[in-house]
Regions:
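Short helix-start
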Residues: 4-8, 29-55
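A short, Lys/Arg-enriched interface patch at domain edges and termini
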Residues: 44-82
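Polyanion-binding surface elements
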Residues: 1-20
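DNA major-groove recognition helix of helix-turn-helix
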Residues: 25
Length: 82
């Protein structure tokens, strides 16, 4: 997992569009930074925001390492489809 995720990648984690993620950043729902090539979400924020959703789907609490592994899996799967 990179230090920052794009809004597209964050959308994959939250099952939302990249536009929805940008709106969430602008509305202060999630932390993000604006760069010349678009918004980015810091890794720590991506972990925080996606933890509840992923843990509810898994039906249990996950360690940070497990959570990062699942996030990497989601990102890899979606990149292969794109």
């Amino acid at each position: 997992m990179d230090d920052f995720l794009s809004t597209k990648e964050m959308g994959w984690l939250l099952d939302r569009s990249a536009g929805s993620v940008r709106r969430m950043i602008r509305d202060g729902e999630i932390e993000g930074v604006r760069l010349p090539d678009g918004f980015r979400v810091p890794k720590d924020e991506a972990l925080r925001v996606s933890r509840d959703r992923i843990e509810s789907e898994a039906g249990r609490k996950l360690s940070d390492r497990e959570l990062e592994g699942l996030i990497d899996e989601v990102l890899t799967t979606n990149e292969e489809r794109a």
